[in-house]
């Protein structure tokens, strides 16, 4: 009313000129003309506040009326709904007995009461939300928190009520088709997604764990999908036979068949099997979380196991038996570990859940790797098999081939199997590839055990003859050297020496001096300075061959006495352990390169030397003659001459 009276006042205020800007505003708000426009603005603001208050009062009155009208109208509506539903149910079941006709009445009454309770709850929640927001002043955050707090028990109560309704109205499902449709909808709401992995009763525990583990592996291993499919189908066949734990197994079997299978199964299953999972899930939610956690742990463990067995990384392969295989060669250990992982996955996929539960348990990797390498060696051609016969030279050759310079303490059983797989990997025919060059010099100097087994070394030396590219079968009878091969090797040796070594150390083709240097490495440290210090006391072969340079026959006689001693002593101790110091590795690994440049081969000469000299008994006392010749310093020229003479004389001795 205030607004209307104020709006009727403007006609007496009209004596203003029509061109003024304030005329419309004063007509609206009915204020007299003042000296400035500022009071009019303030008056407009006050008027707006007053009109807003009045409108708010009227709106509040209207809101309270509508709210009260809703509350008063709902019971009559509910009564009408109740009457209609009861009448329809009576018409549906007119020919049924009295005991059955009372059931739809009860179901309709429970439905109407649930609807009424839902309305009451929503209205009270809205009123409480507005009052709490107005009183506490939390804003939207407080409103949402209060609504969430009341929403959780409401959902549980509603689902329980729906379960009761299904239990009461289950007897009528066969007669009425409309109620069957509603029942199908209700069963879909009975089992929400977070209840997928529920703890089943005791007789079904093992089946549930099997299904859960199979589902976990199904994502990681493609091999096991064939095993997983039939097992899940078997679980479904089991669910149709046993009534009580069947909904649980249907849930764990597969989510993709969940809706169809649940809607079809629940029509034939008694309703006593429907309600326990609901009560169990509401009463014990922590058990569900623990089951989910365990299932995720199973999937993690299976993925880790398959990943490690395929790629060869991780802690599962960190066994002392497999370290030798991994250190030996990348290809042999890679094939062994991958085949071991595949076999382990197939074994575990067949249903061994005990191996699946322990993450640190490797599925028989060493035996499988040794089997794989043995099969690889069995498939080798015939001309390569005599080269795989001796065992210890293979181990030392692998150390030189890897170039890591570490001593590998590996068990002998794994050495046999894993090192055989390396032989077919090394190239045999082309002389330019560096792999056989690195592997061969240590392969011919057999360790101490090969002194007891000379025939194997003979076979090794004979098998190495065609590798060098020159036929040496006729050079095994003893003969004295002639000067032309000495000159030829003296011409070939310096290019391999110059430009590669910075220090005045001996050339790489000086075999006996390098062996004495290896023996010295065992007695002292492995540093680079110790190499030059240890070389001086061990250089008698260079000095002796330098003194005897005038007569080649005399140098050959000396080499008969001097050359065996470093060969046998160093082959007894140093060929397997001289790789400790990585500083000596470049010099040792460059030895066969300079030897391969010359037409006469060192492989045949060294194999025959070690085979001829290992049974002799004159070699140990000749080692005592070595220390007196330590007075000549190291230089390049005598080393080259001694290297050339040692190679020529050792080859011509055969």
Swiss-Prot record:
Residues 565-575, 601-621 have a biased composition (Low complexity). InterPro entries: AMER (IPR019003). Pfam families: AMER (PF09422). GO terms for molecular function: beta-catenin binding; phosphatidylinositol-4,5-bisphosphate binding. Its main location: membrane. Belongs to the Amer family. This is APC membrane recruitment protein 2. It comes from Danio rerio (Zebrafish). The lineage of its organism: Eukaryota, Metazoa, Chordata, Craniata, Vertebrata. The gene is amer2.
């Amino acid at each position: 009313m205030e607004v209307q009276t104020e709006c009727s006042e403007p006609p007496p205020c009209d004596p203003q000129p029509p061109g003024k800007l304030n005329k419309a505003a004063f007509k609206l708000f009915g204020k007299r003309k003042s000296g400035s426009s500022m009071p009019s603005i303030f008056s407009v603001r006050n008027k707006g506040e007053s009109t807003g208050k009045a409108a708010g009062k009227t709106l509040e009155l209207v809101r309270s009326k509508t709210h009260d009208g809703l509350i008063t109208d709902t019971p009559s509506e509910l009564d009408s709904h109740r009457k209609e539903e009861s009448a329809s149910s009576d018409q549906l079941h007119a020919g049924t007995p009295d005991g059955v006709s009372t059931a739809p009445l009860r179901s309709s009454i429970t439905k109407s009461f649930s609807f009424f309770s839902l309305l009451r709850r929503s209205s009270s929640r809205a009123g409480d939300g507005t009052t709490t927001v107005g009183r506490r002043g939390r804003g939207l955050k407080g409103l949402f928190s209060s609504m969430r707090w009341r929403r959780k028990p409401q959902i549980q109560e509603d689902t329980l009520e729906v379960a009761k309704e299904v239990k009461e109205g289950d007897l009528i499902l066969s007669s009425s088709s409309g109620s069957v449709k509603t029942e199908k909808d209700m069963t879909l709401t009975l089992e929400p997604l977070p209840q997928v992995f529920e703890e089943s009763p005791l007789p079904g525990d093992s089946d549930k764990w099997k299904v859960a583990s199979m589902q976990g592996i199904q994502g990681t291993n493609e091999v096991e999908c064939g095993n997983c499919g039939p097992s899940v189908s078997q679980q479904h066949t089991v669910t149709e036979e046993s009534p009580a734990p069947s909904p649980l197994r249907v849930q764990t079997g597969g989510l993709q068949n969940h809706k169809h299978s649940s809607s079809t199964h629940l029509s034939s299953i008694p309703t006593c099997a429907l309600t326990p999972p609901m009560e169990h899930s509401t009463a014990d939610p922590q058990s569900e979380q623990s089951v989910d956690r365990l299932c995720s742990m199973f999937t993690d463990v299976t993925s880790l196991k398959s990943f490690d067995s395929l790629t060869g990384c991780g802690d599962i392969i960190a066994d002392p038996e497999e370290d030798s295989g991994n250190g030996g060669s990348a290809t042999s250990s890679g094939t062994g570990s991958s085949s071991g992982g595949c076999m382990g996955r197939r074994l575990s996929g067949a249903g061994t859940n005990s191996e699946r539960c322990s993450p640190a348990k490797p599925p028989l990797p060493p035996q499988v790797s040794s089997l794989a390498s043995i099969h690889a060696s069995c498939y080798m051609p015939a001309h390569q098999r005599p080269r795989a016969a001796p065992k210890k030279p293979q181990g030392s050759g692998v150390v030189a081939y890897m170039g890591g310079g570490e001593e590998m303490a590996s068990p002998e059983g794994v050495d046999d199997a894993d090192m055989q797989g390396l032989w077919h990997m090394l190239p045999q025919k082309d002389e330019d590839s560096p792999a056989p060059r690195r592997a061969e010099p240590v392969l011919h100097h057999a360790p101490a055990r090969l002194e007891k087994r000379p025939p194997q070394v003979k076979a090794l030396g004979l098998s190495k003859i065609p590798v060098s590219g020159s036929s040496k079968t006729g050079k095994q009878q003893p003969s004295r050297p002639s000067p032309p091969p000495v000159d030829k090797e003296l011409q070939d040796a310096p290019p391999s020496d110059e430009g590669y070594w910075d220090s005045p150390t001996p050339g790489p083709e000086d075999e006996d001096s390098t062996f004495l240097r290896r023996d010295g490495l065992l007695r002292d440290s492995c540093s680079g300075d110790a190499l030059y210090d240890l070389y001086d006391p061990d250089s008698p072969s260079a000095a002796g061959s330098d003194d005897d340079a005038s007569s080649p026959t005399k140098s050959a006689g000396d080499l008969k006495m001097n050359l065996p001693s470093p060969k046998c002593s160093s082959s007894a101790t140093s060929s397997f352990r001289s790789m400790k110091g990585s500083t000596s590795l470049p010099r040792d690994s460059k030895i066969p390169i300079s030897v391969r440049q010359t037409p006469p081969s060192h492989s045949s000469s060294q194999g025959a030397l070690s085979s001829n000299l290992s049974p002799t008994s004159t070699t140990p006392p000749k080692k005592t003659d070595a220390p007196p010749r330590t007075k000549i310093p190291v230089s390049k020229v005598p080393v080259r001459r001694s290297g050339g003479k040692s190679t020529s004389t050792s080859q011509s001795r055969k």
